[in-house]
């Protein structure tokens, strides 16, 4: 699986996806446009370090985004290089895990939007359902037990190198 993740075509598609998202630079200050020549020059070195288990993501850049209620949402922005690697991993894990998710789940899933979720709620209302629960769990990701997540990942991903890469690139952000 790691070979498929790091394959040039998958990595290039990942970069294009990161570029399309137009995100801000990470802690290194490298923009999306600056990352392309860097990746072209250093992709082999990066992939070699990943294969050897020696790749360490950069620290995330911490920012606070104002919320409508006056509070702030704290975000960690990875570097463009790390986001590209995260996207490359995601592109290969989504086909494995997408079929396992509940049909009524819409958050952070491909080809599902907030509008789709609203249409589903409308459908439930038309079927006679009259109650709904709205939740916004404070600091939810920060409170997840990452060991449980990694063990769930191991059930379907037998390549331990991928499990370790996910642990470093996704769960430390």
Task: Annotate each language-model stretch with its function.
Residues 24-27, 31, 76, 115-153:
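Conserved catalytic palm subdomain of right-hand nucleotidyl-transferase polymerases, strongest
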Residues 169-173:
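Conserved small/polar residues in nucleotide/adenosyl-binding loops
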Residues 90-102, 130-131:
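Active-site palm subdomain of RNA-directed nucleic acid polymerases
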Residues 20-34, 57-84, 100-113, 133:
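Short, conserved non-catalytic motifs in the polymerase core
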Residues 26, 65, 89, 121, ...:
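A residue-level signal for conserved active-site and pocket-lining positions in enzyme catalytic cores
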Residues 34-56:
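Amphipathic alpha-helical blocks
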Residues 38-39, 77, 81-85, 93, ...:
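Hydrophobic (often cysteine-bearing) scaffold residues that line and stabilize catalytic clefts
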Residues 1-40:
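Non-catalytic, polymerase-adjacent accessory regions of viral genome-replication enzymes
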């Amino acid at each position: 699986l790691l070979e498929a993740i790091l394959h040039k075509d998958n990595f290039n598609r990942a970069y294009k996806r990161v570029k399309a998202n137009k995100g801000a630079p990470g802690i290194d200050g490298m923009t999306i446009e600056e990352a392309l020549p860097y990746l072209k020059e250093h992709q082999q070195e990066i992939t070699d370090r990943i294969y050897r288990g020696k790749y360490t993501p950069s620290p995330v850049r911490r920012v606070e985004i104002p919320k409508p209620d006056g509070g702030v949402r704290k975000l960690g922005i990875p570097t463009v290089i790390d986001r590209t690697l995260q996207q490359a991993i995601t592109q290969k894990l989504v086909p494995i895990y997408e079929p396992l998710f509940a049909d009524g789940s819409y958050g952070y899933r491909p080809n599902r939007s907030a509008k789709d979720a609203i249409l589903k709620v409308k459908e439930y209302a038309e079927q006679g359902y009259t109650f709904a629960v709205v939740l916004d769990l404070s600091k939810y990701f920060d409170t997840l037990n990452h060991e449980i997540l990694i063990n769930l990942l191991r059930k379907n991903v037998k390549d331990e190198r991928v499990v370790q890469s996910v642990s470093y690139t996704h769960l430390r952000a």
